[in-house]
Structure formats: structure tokens, C-alpha cells
Amino acid sequence: MLLLGRLPRPAWVPGSRAQRCSSLAALEGPARTRSYWRYLRRLVCGAPQPPYAHVCQVGDPVLRVVAAPVEPEQLAGPELQRLVGRMVQVMRRRGCVGLSAPQLGVPLQVLALEFPDKLLRAFSPRLRELRQMEPFPLRVLVNPSLRVLDSRLVTFPEGCESVAGFLACVPRFQAVQISGLDPKGEPVVWSASGWTARIIQHEMDHLQGCLFIDKMDSGTFTNLHWMEVND
């Protein structure tokens, strides 16, 4: 399991603003204190270890790492199966349509994707048609690669469990083909278009340390709760 340490602090220059507030400290923000019960739980149980039962948030270094391929000897092994099981569990609990291993703190090339009918029904018929939404069953891909089938760019809003509470318009290719292995090491090839192609591209980006905010139209970046703030 790869453990990531803290980011190195920037060089201290006498007489500079770094004496008063380093850029890293400014990024980290004020110190966060734990509740007594959280402290006791951590003391007794230890720190959580990946794969987490939560989704890592933007700012976590693991989301900016290029994920490593799963080695052949790891295929069908207990660690990979545990990772896949946790990914599916978290994805379904969060009600999202895709999740990558880095989002649970594991920088490996593993994706889980699923768009069940119950999530599709949350969208109006008009939006389903406009965004070319179709349900698909659970698919897990190991060491996936992507090929563009239709290079036309289509722009729609999307969000991410690792940038919780925000969305923005992002251009994506109309159709792609993803190929890789299933958790047992069997080859998988999947061609998709429309919204399914968007989901695939979004999750593939995670394996390259890329988030949707890197490709978004920044003028459309939206806090989903902005209206509540004004109430």
C-alpha cells in the first residue's frame, strides 16, 4: 500500500511573507481539531487505511498521482478483490455512476462503473434524450486504455465525488472504446457513446491524476448550494 507523506514546505526566505504565513499553510487553512470521541476512535483503532470507505477530496495528493498498473500476479488476488468490493460498495452508497481506485486512496488503474435504472429515472425524459443517457450494468476494468471513436466534442455539466458540491460544463468526445481486464484477468472491450462515453472519460482522467476542473469551462463552475446560502 502506498503511503503518501505531507507535501514539503516551501523554502523560508528571511524578510519574505513566508515568515508570516507560508504558502503551504495558506493552502492547508486553519488547524482542524478532532472531537474527543473521534480522537478516542483513532487512538484505539488507528488511522483509516486505503481503500477508504469515503471518497478522497480535491487537495489530497493521491488524486494528482498517475495511477500504476495492476501487476499480473495481483489479478484475482485477495487485495484486488477487496479493493473492487470496496469501490462498488462506496459507489452504490454514494449513488454515483463511476469511481476510480485513486478516489479511495489507492493509486492503481482500476475503475468501477454502473448506471442503473433507478439513477437514470432521476433525470427527466427530455434530459435523458438530450444527453443520450442509457443505463448499463456494473463493469469493473483493470489497467484500462481508451481509444476515441468519434472526436466530436459534446459539452454538458458534470460533477465529481472528489469535488463534492460543485459542477461545471466539460467537453467530452462523443464516442470512445475502453479496453482492459476484468478482476479475474479476462479481456474486456467496451464501445460507448453519449453519456456513457462521458462517464468513461471522466473516470479514465482520474487514472492520470486529472480532475474535471482541469478541463471545465471555468465560467460555468457552480456551487450546487449557492441558493441555500442566499436564503
From Swiss-Prot:
Keyword DNA damage: no
Molecular-function GO terms, alphabetical: metal ion binding; peptide deformylase activity
Binding site for substrate: 59, 157, 159
Catalytic reactions of this protein: N-terminal N-formyl-L-methionyl-[peptide] + H2O = N-terminal L-methionyl-[peptide] + formate
Gene Ontology terms: cellular component: mitochondrion
Biological processes per GO annotation: positive regulation of cell population proliferation; post-translational protein modification; translation
Enzyme Commission number(s) from the entry: 3.5.1.88
Residues that bind Co(2+): 160, 202, 206
Main location: mitochondrion
Record keyword Protein biosynthesis present: yes
Pfam families the UniProt entry points to: Pep_deformylase
Keywords, in A-Z order: Cobalt, Hydrolase, Metal-binding, Mitochondrion, Protein biosynthesis, Transit peptide
Cofactors that this protein relies on: Co(2+)
The record's free-text note on cofactor binding: Binds 1 Co(2+) ion.
Stretches the record annotates as Hydrophobic dimerization interface: 153-163
Localization (cell): Mitochondrion
Oligomer and partners: Homodimer.
HAMAP family assigned: Pep_deformylase (MF_00163)
Function (record text): Removes the formyl group from the N-terminal Met of newly synthesized proteins.
Protein family (similarity comment): Belongs to the polypeptide deformylase family.
Name under which the protein is recorded: Peptide deformylase, mitochondrial
Originating organism: Mus musculus (Mouse)
